[in-house]
């Protein structure tokens, strides 16, 4: 049980770092980044739309 919780926390921290890095290091505005959902999450994020509306191999919005 403890291991499962640890993995969950590590994943959460990693996601936070990745999204913060995208928001501040990206060339796009923070607002656009924030409403963009990565393809590997299936495009079903609670914070925004899919980055790739025409499919994962299509152009990024």
Swiss-Prot record:
Chain residues in the propeptide: 21-31
GO molecular function (one): sodium channel inhibitor activity
Disulfide cross-links: 36-51, 37-45, 39-56
First and last residue of the signal peptide: 1-20
Family, as annotated: Belongs to the sea anemone short toxin (type III) family.
Subcellular location(s) per record: Secreted; Nematocyst
Transmembrane segments: none
InterPro entries assigned: Neurotoxin_3_Anemonia, Neurotoxin_3_sf
Protein task: Sodium channel inhibitor. 5 uM completely inhibits voltage-gated sodium channel (Nav) inactivation.
Keywords of the record: Disulfide bond, Nematocyst, Neurotoxin, Secreted, Signal, Toxin
Protein name: Delta-actitoxin-Avd2c
Organism the protein comes from: Anemonia viridis
Record-linked Pfam families: ATX_III
Domain of life from the UniProt record: Eukaryota
Gene Ontology CC terms, in alphabetical order: extracellular region; nematocyst
């Amino acid at each position: 049980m403890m291991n499962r919780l640890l993995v969950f926390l590590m994943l959460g921290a990693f996601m936070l770092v990745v999204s913060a890095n995208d928001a501040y290091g990206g060339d796009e505005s923070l607002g656009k980044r924030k409403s963009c959902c990565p393809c590997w999450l299936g495009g079903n994020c609670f914070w925004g739309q899919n980055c790739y509306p025409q499919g994962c191999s299509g152009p990024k919005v």
